[in-house]
Regions:
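Residues forming the flavin
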Residues: 1-46, 50-198
């Protein structure tokens, strides 16, 4: 496959994002939303989809993460967690695996248009200048690629809105949560208690 990514590869992207956090200089195409690994690269590394998995795909995905360097504990933890510090390396390892199997990645390559004739895809246009012949194109734009959605609308391609959740972070002392759920503020055998508020 050919993977076109509007942002940078993980190492360069990390520098670009740190420059934004430190100096306030935003790169509109490579930031916390766009770049290798997507928005999840700068998340806390929790891997929970809350989706029923009757076909076992989730287990396969977690196994791939372990092959790429994630801790093996994620295979049996109720709430698997990678940690932000490991995500960049894991994402890079996965890219190298795909490249070794013949896949190609192009960074700083935004799909700016589609060439459609007789309701069939003929090519994708990259950065408004390069035409790449294609009959199949899988778009994975995330939430922030409004220009991509506008381009799809221009071509009368049907789209359906996905439900969108916005969360807030609420912090409670761990001893309080342990007391409420375990009946004691600390328990070495059980570890830290977790909970979810909805």
């Amino acid at each position: 496959p050919l993977v076109l990514e509007r942002g940078e590869e993980a190492d360069k992207r990390q520098e670009t994002v740190e420059n934004f956090w430190k100096n306030g200089i935003l790169d509109p195409d490579s930031n916390v939303q766009f770049g290798e690994g997507g928005a999840g690269t700068f998340s806390d590394g929790k891997l929970n989809t809350l989706v029923k998995d009757t076909f076992g795909r989730g287990k396969e995905v977690l196994s791939r993460f372990v092959e790429a360097g994630a801790p093996s504990e994620i295979l049996y933890q109720q709430k698997p967690h990678l940690g932000t510090d490991q995500l960049v390396g894991i994402v890079q390892f996965m890219r190298h695996q795909i490249e070794e199997m013949g896949g190609e990645f192009r960074f700083r390559s935004t799909v700016t248009d589609l060439m459609i004739r007789d309701r069939k895809l003929n090519a994708v246009i990259v950065n408004a200048k390069e035409e790449i012949p294609a009959e199949i194109c899988i778009l994975a734009p995330g939430h922030s690629a409004r220009d991509t959605f506008a381009m799809l609308e221009k071509h009368n391609i049907n789209m359906e809105p996905k439900s969108f959740a916005v969360g807030v972070r609420v912090e409670h002392p761990q001893t309080m949560i342990n007391q409420d759920l375990y009946g004691e503020p600390e328990n070495d055998r059980l570890g830290a208690s977790s909970y979810k508020v909805t």
